[in-house]
């Protein structure tokens, strides 16, 4: 059981016999009336996101989730294959288990996979990863028609928007939660 003061992003709750992961939450204390917590919950099975409001101080059942450190091995065309770092056991996770962040997976990358009752719920990448730019067009000085950014293809095949000064071969730090460029990494 968890109190609403224990809420944090990533916490998995058991609501109506469904596992719901907190994606976003906000404590609200209105001028009149009791405080409450507004949340966005993602169903870990279907991926559906819903809004739910809890009164402050309410106890909510948490799911017993086991997070394991794993290494991403490869993509077999239908699944991401990961290996448990302790037991060397391999697991096949469907693409949707990593969500949009899956496009930033590189072989031998360290990831965390959450399990409940022996079943893999979802995988998480580090908050930021360093990836090399495979291709980008040269940026034209003074070109501000698209906000000072241009598309770049990364070594994983993902395409993101980067500043005009980025060149092919640069290594970039990417936020895996949003898919945004953070900085250029010195080689």
From Swiss-Prot:
Which is a GO BP term held by this UniProt record?
peptide biosynthetic process
Which GO terms label this protein's molecular function in UniProt?
translation elongation factor activity
Segments spanning the bilayer are none
In what pathway does it function? Protein biosynthesis; polypeptide chain elongation
- Asked whether the keyword Mitochondrion is assigned, the reply is no
- Give UniProt keywords alphabetically: Cytoplasm, Elongation factor, Protein biosynthesis
Record's GO cellular component terms: cytoplasm
Superkingdom as given in the UniProt entry: Bacteria
- Answer yes or no on keyword Cytoplasm: yes
**Where in or outside the cell is it found?**
Cytoplasm
The UniProt family comment states: Belongs to the elongation factor P family.
Q: What does this protein do?
A: Involved in peptide bond synthesis. Stimulates efficient translation and peptide-bond synthesis on native or reconstituted 70S ribosomes in vitro. Probably functions indirectly by altering the affinity of the ribosome for aminoacyl-tRNA, thus increasing their reactivity as acceptors for peptidyl transferase.
Q: What is this protein called?
A: Elongation factor P
Q: Which organism is it from?
A: Corynebacterium aurimucosum (strain ATCC 700975 / DSM 44827 / CIP 107346 / CN-1) (Corynebacterium nigricans)
Q: Which gene encodes it?
A: efp
């Amino acid at each position: 059981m968890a109190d609403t003061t224990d809420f944090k992003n990533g916490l998995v709750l058991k609501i109506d016999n469904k596992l719901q992961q907190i994606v976003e939450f906000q404590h609200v204390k209105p001028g009149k009336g009791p405080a409450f917590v507004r949340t966005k919950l993602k169903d870990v099975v279907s991926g559906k996101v819903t809004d739910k409001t809890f009164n402050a101080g309410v106890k909510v059942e948490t799911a017993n989730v086991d997070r394991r450190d794993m290494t991403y091995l490869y993509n077999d065309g239908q699944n991401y294959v990961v290996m448990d770092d302790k037991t060397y056991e391999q697991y096949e996770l469907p693409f949707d288990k990593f969500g949009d962040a899956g496009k930033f997976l590189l072989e031998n990358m360290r990831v965390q996979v959450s399990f409940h009752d022996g079943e893999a719920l979802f995988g998480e990448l580090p908050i930021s990863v360093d990836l090399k730019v495979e291709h980008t067009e040269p940026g034209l000085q003074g070109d501000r028609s698209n906000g000072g950014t241009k598309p770049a293809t990364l070594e994983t095949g993902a395409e993101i928007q980067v500043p005009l000064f980025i060149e092919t071969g640069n290594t970039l730090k990417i936020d895996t939660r949003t898919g945004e460029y953070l900085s250029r990494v010195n080689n």
